Amino acid sequence: MAAYSWWRQPSWMVDNKRSRMTPNLPWLLSALTLLHLTMHANGLKRGVQDLKCTTNNMRVWDCTWPAPLGVSPGTVKDICIKDRFHSCHPLETTNVKIPALSPGDHEVTINYLNGFQSKFTLNEKDVSLIPETPEILDLSADFFTSSLLLKWNDRGSALPHPSNATWEIKVLQNPRTEPVALVLLNTMLSGKDTVQHWNWTSDLPLQCATHSVSIRWHIDSPHFSGYKEWSDWSPLKNISWIRNTETNVFPQDKVVLAGSNMTICCMSPTKVLSGQIGNTLRPLIHLYGQTVAIHILNIPVSENSGTNIIFITDDDVYGTVVFAGYPPDVPQKLSCETHDLKEIICSWNPGRITGLVGPRNTEYTLFESISGKSAVFHRIEGLTNETYRLGVQMHPGQEIHNFTLTGRNPLGQAQSAVVINVTERVAPHDPTSLKVKDINSTVVTFSWYLPGNFTKINLLCQIEICKANSKKEVRNATIRGAEDSTYHVAVDKLNPYTAYTFRVRCSSKTFWKWSRWSDEKRHLTTEATPSKGPDTWREWSSDGKNLIVYWKPLPINEANGKILSYNVSCSLNEETQSVLEIFDPQHRAEIQLSKNDYIISVVARNSAGSSPPSKIASMEIPNDDITVEQAVGLGNRIFLTWRHDPNMTCDYVIKWCNSSRSEPCLLDWRKVPSNSTETVIESDQFQPGVRYNFYLYGCTNQGYQLLRSIIGYVEELAPIVAPNFTVEDTSADSILVKWDDIPVEELRGFLRGYLFYFQKGERDTPKTRSLEPHHSDIKLKNITDISQKTLRIADLQGKTSYHLVLRAYTHGGLGPEKSMFVVTKENSVGLIIAILIPVAVAVIVGVVTSILCYRKREWIKETFYPDIPNPENCKALQFQKSVCEGSNALKTLEMNPCTPNNVEVLESRSIVPKIEDTEIISPVAERPGERSEVDPENHVVVSYCPPIIEEEITNPAADEVGGASQVVYIDVQSMYQPQAKAEEEQDVDPVVVAGYKPQMRLPISPAVEDTAAEDEEGKTAGYRPQANVNTWNLVSPDSPRSTDSNNEVVSFGSPCSINSRQFLIPPKDEDSPKSNGGGWSFTNFFQNKPND
């Protein structure tokens, strides 16, 4: 927008003041003028910005603006719109209503009385479309369904063009201020006033609270480009329930959708303590005062009696019943048909069970739109999901019918439709009143009654014919329809004297469905003459004088009636010799005839007449080239084959009988055509395990001739008895057994062989109670030659018990076993050999032993009986009498205290074998300090009691030896010397080699040593003492004198003293050489000594 203004002053005002102007007056006037213009311009600018135009019908714009600064609102003169007819409109205030302007910019000028002007540029885009506040015409409530129905006028006539309207509806529940429902609803304004409706169902029963509704709307017109805004909310419209009953719980007997949520309230004068659905407690919701509610989520399908809801107060109990279920399902498989073209029956499946019964059950209405006829079906019995049926009477002459089936219950409705041509949907009723009338023995008339008006269609009927032991036969018949009529059909090709069962069903010729089968009608046709003669056979008696004639009863389809008797005649050269009448049920005749060739005739007779004769020759052509064959069948049948014989012109006859029966053997026979070469004999009389004889006869002009003779079984079984066998002969190494044949009746099959088991065993031992072939110690013999009746078992042991078992077998299996225990005879030659061999071996061993003992007698004597030396001849105990006897100073048995010294025994490296050192353990404890200085591997510290010697020896070397308290053994020589080689004997000291080496050598002078050597050299053959006798002390080493002696040279003791430390007998040494001449060995037993 653009605006401008100006200010003019009257000239008289200028003239009056001109005389009073001072020099500063022009400047002051200019400043005031500029200030006035600035303030006016700001006021005009604000007025342009605050101009607002609205419209509520797009026909008239309502514009308002604030007056400029310094201008009174009442000084508006007019408003002018440029380029518009009647462009100026007088005004008195700052508000004007002008007709809607065309799209585009328009210049608007506002003139004031004081001369001011305001100019604006106005466009439709700057105008706001704000509809008038809507008015609610009516608000009603359905308290049973808790529904509100709202009505209002949309005022569509006020708008110049059709427009879309959006309505916003707000529902409040007192005392709550928040809306419980806020819904948008779209409608079309058509240019005329229309009353709009809106329905809303409350979760809370309307009885429980006051409900208020308010609406507003919004217009969306494509012909208006300005702003579109919501109208103001309409005034609230309230609705409340006026309590006129004593009911306290709402809703009452409500029908709800299963799985939905619902709220139930209780308006009680006293405090409500609890609320529950069924037996389940629910939390209470306080609404206002004493009014409470409970909320139920996902309510299940109710039982037939509904679901109980109870509120308990201090002094009473209140409640209601809720019925939860489903709306009707769409009717399924809707089909319509007619049974009699008078009434149409429609059937359907109701689908899902609604769960509602009684007055809330689904009601079905079948409406035919062409005729306008309808029928109602209301099932109240139960909840079964069965097929429903509903009938509608047909309109005469109407064939096309359009049916609509509607199902309704309190929760909703569903529909299904079908269009049919009724003449193509005919399923007649069941035929009734069946009748059968004979025309002759093979043709009858069958009739039935069928209700219905079928004059315009043809009927297709099926007649089912059934006779005993035969397949059912169905015949079709097309019949011209009639109204409630009896229909007749001729049934031919029947058998005489046969019981039949008839029944019928019908449909239309175009076929929709068959009717159900009628009841059965039984009928027996009349008799006729037999169509064939009896099947005949003959056998000569065992004495050959009488001919026995056999015949089989005629089957029903050939007898054509009840056979009363049979006429049997024989003729010779076409002259009848005799005639016999045999009454039924006898089927054999015996005639005495000669050996001539007679022709036997048999004729069957019933009430209608006689059959053609059956003829058979009495003579049989002999055949000597006959061999007996074997055959095995399967189940209750046996298969026989033969070669074609061109000489056979009539037929073949197979006769069979039980082989155990006496002659004449006849069980049954069968005739087959002459061109056949095989047949299967089957009979219910065949039994498994029974042998039958089969005879094949061929027929020629001269008579019958036996062609083959066969024995066989229809099924082989195992024998029922074991072969009876005995022992014929027994030897030391063999047994001969013999057995008998098994009777045919007990064999029950063709004998294939015998199984013979045997093993060692005694009677009544667990091992031999039964023999199994898989045991390794059991021997088996399979005898396949059935003519063999003996068996010799060889390679047996003498005088041994054997267990023998014999079993027969066929293809049907093994028969039972027959067992026997047999002991073989004793073998005399073996017994003699068993005695002689041990005797001979004993004699040989005795002779060899005697020879060896004689040759080794000296060695045996030395080994087992050595010479025991006489102790009196031992010089080891012969001592010098001067030493051991006659001295009072020698106290041999005197016990004196002994102070032990430690003796270290060191191992010396000797070139000769040594005696193993012996460790002597002292009773005195060892000193740890002294032991640590000596290597434990090279020496042993022992306790030693040195004897005290009073004799003094002046050898200075002895001071070192005798004065030490520790005595060290360097070596202990054995009393036996090692064997020296020949070349080494010259270098050995004769004294050392000749005799015993003492344990210790006492120091002596050279002169004494030489003298001693000479003396010892001559005494090498005798015993050498262990010590020098000259050094022996005559007193006990433990005597006080010996203890106090200062003599440092001492002896180890005397052999006569109990305190001696000398080794009289050397210990065993593993390293010492062993003697090779003595001792026991097996090789020495066979060697001779040099002196032997």
From Swiss-Prot:
Motif Box 1 motif mapped to chain: 864-872
InterPro entries linked: FN3_dom (IPR003961), FN3_sf (IPR036116), Hematopoietin_rcpt_Gp130_CS (IPR003529), Ig-like_fold (IPR013783), LIF-R-like_Ig-like (IPR048497), LIFR_D2 (IPR040817), LIFR_N (IPR040901), Type-I_Cytokine_Rcpt (IPR050379)
GO molecular function: ciliary neurotrophic factor receptor binding; growth factor binding; leukemia inhibitory factor receptor activity; oncostatin-M receptor activity
Extent of motif WSXWS motif: 514-518
Region (Disordered): 1009-1092
Pfam family membership, one: LIFR_N
Gene Ontology biological-process entries: cytokine-mediated signaling pathway; positive regulation of cell population proliferation
Biased composition range(s): Polar residues: 1027-1062, 1081-1092
Sequence ranges on the Cytoplasmic membrane side: 854-1092
Extracellular side: 44-828
Glycosylation sites: 164, 199, 238, 261, 385, 402, 421, 440, 453, 476, 567, 647, 658, 675, 724, 782
Record flagged with keyword Transmembrane helix: yes
Sequence positions bearing Phosphoserine: 922, 1039
Disulphide bridges: 53-63, 80-88, 208-265, 336-346, 461-506
Domain called Fibronectin type-III: residue spans: 45-126, 330-429, 430-529, 533-624, 622-714, 719-828
Residue intervals passing through the bilayer: 829-853
Tissue: Placenta, liver, kidney, heart, lung, brain, and embryos. The liver may be the primary site of synthesis of the secreted form.
Domain notes: The WSXWS motif appears to be necessary for proper protein folding and thereby efficient intracellular transport and cell-surface receptor binding. The box 1 motif is required for JAK interaction and/or activation.
Assembly and interaction partners: Heterodimer composed of LIFR and IL6ST. The heterodimer formed by LIFR and IL6ST interacts with the complex formed by CNTF and CNTFR.
Family according to the record: Belongs to the type I cytokine receptor family. Type 2 subfamily.
Name used for this protein in its record: Leukemia inhibitory factor receptor
